[in-house]
Amino acid sequence: MARKPALSPEEARAEALGTALATIERKYGKGAVMKLSDDAHVNIPVIPTGSIGLDLALGVGGIPRGRISEIFGPESSGKTTLTLHIIAECQRLGGTCAFVDAEHALDVSYARRLGVNTDELLISQPDYGEQALDIADMLVRSGAVDLVVVDSVAALIPQAELEGDMGETQVGGHARLMSHAMRRLTGTIHKSRTSVIFINQIRMKIGVTGYGSPETTTGGNALKFYSSVRLDIRRIQTLKDKEESFGSRTRVKVVKNKVAPPFRSAVFDILYGLGISRAGELLDLGIEAKIIDQSGSWFAFGAEKLGQGREKVRALLDENIDLRNQIEAKVVEFLGLHPREFTPTAEDIAESQDPVLED
């Protein structure tokens, strides 16, 4: 009987690896270990945000599925508004959404005006943090929910703190709660393709002066570490008609992105009671891309005069859907090649990096 030719070191390594992979696959199922090229996320499944500029800034067209995302910012900056738009977009695509309202503050009528089908929206108003995160975990494990929103991390009070005496401190309890929840949720979320969004608030660090940002988010470092996308949303201007304010100009910075390049931004208007102004955003992006010409207070799209005054043109685009779609197609084509980026500060770079987790 002829002897098998001796294998070269490279062939022996390849055979050993193949045997190990086959054993792992038999024991833990197909896909337990694979080469990155076997499952390359060229087209990452996403949920649109309701903002054209933000979808483009995220690099993949929206919030990635099967990942954890964090939306944080100061009070009244538009965090919940943006999240409700994401819910509306998910429902429009036929998805099932759940809203874990730890703050007990969801405005149902406002959600309807933003396009959310509240009759189909699953809502939970938990009593304490562990209950909220357990409900979120069970919804994800069901595999039947496309989007779970937790509003907000700051309201996820540990049960021990809730049942303790007023003034009694539970040092690190909130951070431990979030760390434990993230470890449980991450693997389940990836397998289920559910997108989980945590809304978070900003707090001021105690005793920080000089170098470094005095701001931080609540809940410790675990959420920063496990989030694939982190969005910093800020109100940068109040929109006024004479003396009466009717909305706010808002900037969203992508300070962390594991699915596309970070440090991109989007600017849009949030109109009180109406949410993100898609027509207003298209007008701004069209001017930036030189698709819409502005001469003084007059606006034109090619040879077509759109009108005089920004608000009148915005109203026109709200009514004329065909015209809006034409402008949108050109804007998306331009910004897909020329994304709006910002120069990151030291704080932005720190936010984009995974923090060191402590047990």
Curated annotation (Swiss-Prot):
Its main location: cytoplasm. It is found in: Cytoplasm. Transmembrane segments: none annotated. Keywords: ATP-binding, Cytoplasm, DNA damage, DNA recombination, DNA repair, DNA-binding, Nucleotide-binding, SOS response. The keyword ATP-binding applies. The keyword Glycoprotein does not apply. GO terms for molecular function: ATP binding; ATP hydrolysis activity; ATP-dependent DNA damage sensor activity; damaged DNA binding; single-stranded DNA binding. It comes from the Bacteria. CDD domains: RecA. SMART domains: AAA. Pfam families: RecA, RecA_C. GO terms for biological process: DNA recombination; DNA repair; SOS response. Coiled coil: none annotated. Belongs to the RecA family. Can catalyze the hydrolysis of ATP in the presence of single-stranded DNA, the ATP-dependent uptake of single-stranded DNA by duplex DNA, and the ATP-dependent hybridization of homologous single-stranded DNAs. It interacts with LexA causing its activation and leading to its autocatalytic cleavage. This is Protein RecA. It comes from Desulfovibrio desulfuricans (strain ATCC 27774 / DSM 6949 / MB).
